[in-house]
């Protein structure tokens, strides 16, 4: 028996919701922007192989790979439920650049834990699995947060609530929006991008942040796309992080002039996203970003839509 799970890229924060909003995205051309994990029966308790475009960025020792840690916490949870852990062989197909702001670690974590759960006939509930995903994400970034793993796993636009046993709930968004994702090919460490933020904020910034986030959520529920786009402003992180992103200011200015609704930093960067209301504008912005924002052969630009499905079983073979 074997199972393969694909986990899509995600936009942490979506500018307006620092650590509490996240959106899953997939390219409109059908290409896979995310990681895949295979779980199959093995002869040992655990073995791991790696492949994919960004495999050379992974640690050589399998026990230093986050997938190994996912297996360990999954085994811990099965023990509490008196469920037998099967001997397995796992393969991580690493298609996502590390330190990209596209939820790369979340892709590996979600694909690994979802595949492990599927392989063992789903002994863990959705929320139990999501809690483990947040725990693993915290191990990498230094603090538990769900704004990448929740959309990556559940799909769509997710709001982190973390009350009444509910970690995250989906917020209705706009199917007509195109999300242009541009990764320049350089790395920004999440931990470094967090250290650059101030320890305290001015009262007017706190008020602006609350107004923007509340206004955005209201506009999503009341189906006002223009208002929603206007509310996507970041007063918490972007003013401090944009200096880590070469040409970000120019890219944002061009996208606005080309008709994009808004442009922001995806997660902690260096990937940016531009939301466009029609395909022609999205493709125009995409071409400019490919020529002016991408810095090397590892960079790329994709025109995407919201991925409503999140992680999914794609078969039994990579």
From Swiss-Prot:
Q: Where in the cell is it found?
A: Cytoplasm
Question: Does Phosphoprotein count among this protein's keywords?
Answer: no
The entry's keywords: Amino-acid biosynthesis, ATP-binding, Cytoplasm, Kinase, Nucleotide-binding, Threonine biosynthesis, Transferase
Query: Which biological process, per GO, is one annotated for this protein?
Result: threonine biosynthetic process
Extract one GO cellular component term from the record. Answer: cytoplasm
Pathway it belongs to?
Answer: Amino-acid biosynthesis; L-threonine biosynthesis; L-threonine from L-aspartate: step 4/5
Can you name one GO molecular function term for this protein? ATP binding
Catalytic reactions on record: L-homoserine + ATP = O-phospho-L-homoserine + ADP + H(+)
Q: Which domain of life is it from?
A: Bacteria
The reply to whether Ribosomal protein figures as a keyword in the UniProt entry is no
The UniProt annotation places ATP binding at: 97-107
What is the E.C. number? 2.7.1.39
Q: Sorted alphabetically, which InterPro entries does this protein's record hold?
A: GHMP_kinase_C_dom (IPR013750), GHMP_kinase_C_sf (IPR036554), GHMP_kinase_N_dom (IPR006204), GHMP_knse_ATP-bd_CS (IPR006203), Homoserine_kinase (IPR000870), Ribosomal_Su5_D2-typ_SF (IPR020568), Ribsml_uS5_D2-typ_fold_subgr (IPR014721)
One matching Pfam family: GHMP_kinases_C
Q: Which NCBIfam families match?
A: PRK01212.1-4, thrB
Purpose of the protein: Catalyzes the ATP-dependent phosphorylation of L-homoserine to L-homoserine phosphate.
The family classification in the record reads:
Belongs to the GHMP kinase family. Homoserine kinase subfamily.
What is the protein's given name?
A: Homoserine kinase
Organism equals: Aliivibrio salmonicida (strain LFI1238) (Vibrio salmonicida (strain LFI1238))
């Amino acid at each position: 028996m074997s199972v393969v799970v694909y986990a899509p890229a995600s936009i942490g924060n979506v500018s307006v919701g620092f650590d509490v909003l996240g959106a899953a995205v997939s390219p409109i051309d059908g290409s896979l922007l995310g990681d895949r994990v295979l779980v199959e029966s093995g002869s040992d308790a655990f073995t791991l192989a790696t492949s994919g475009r960004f495999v050379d960025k992974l640690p050589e020792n399998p026990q230093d790979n986050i997938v190994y840690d996912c297996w360990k916490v999954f085994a811990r949870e099965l023990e509490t439920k008196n469920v037998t852990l099967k001997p397995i062989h796992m393969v991580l197909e690493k298609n996502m650049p590390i330190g990209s702001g596209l939820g790369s670690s979340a892709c590996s974590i979600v694909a690994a834990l979802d595949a492990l759960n599927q392989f063992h006939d789903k002994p863990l509930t959705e929320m139990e699995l999501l809690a483990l995903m947040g725990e693993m994400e915290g191990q990498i970034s230094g603090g538990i947060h769900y704004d990448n793993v929740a959309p990556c796993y559940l799909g769509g636009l997710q709001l982190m609530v973390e009350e009444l046993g509910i970690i995250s709930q989906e917020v209705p968004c706009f199917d007509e929006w195109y999300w242009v994702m541009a990764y320049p090919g350089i790395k920004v460490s999440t931990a470094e991008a967090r250290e650059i933020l101030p320890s305290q904020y001015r009262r007017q910034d706190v008020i602006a942040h609350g107004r923007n986030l509340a206004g955005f959520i209201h506009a999503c529920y009341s189906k006002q796309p223009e208002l929603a786009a206007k509310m996507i402003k970041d007063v918490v992180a972007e003013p401090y992080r944009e200096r880590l992103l070469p040409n970000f200011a120019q890219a944002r200015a061009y996208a606005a002039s080309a008709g994009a609704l808004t442009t922001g930093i995806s997660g902690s960067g260096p990937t940016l996203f531009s939301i466009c209301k029609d395909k022609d504008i999205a493709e125009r912005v995409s071409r400019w970003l490919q020529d002016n924002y991408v810095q090397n052969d590892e960079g790329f630009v994709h025109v995407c839509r919201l991925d409503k499905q999140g992680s999914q079983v794609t078969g039994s073979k990579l």
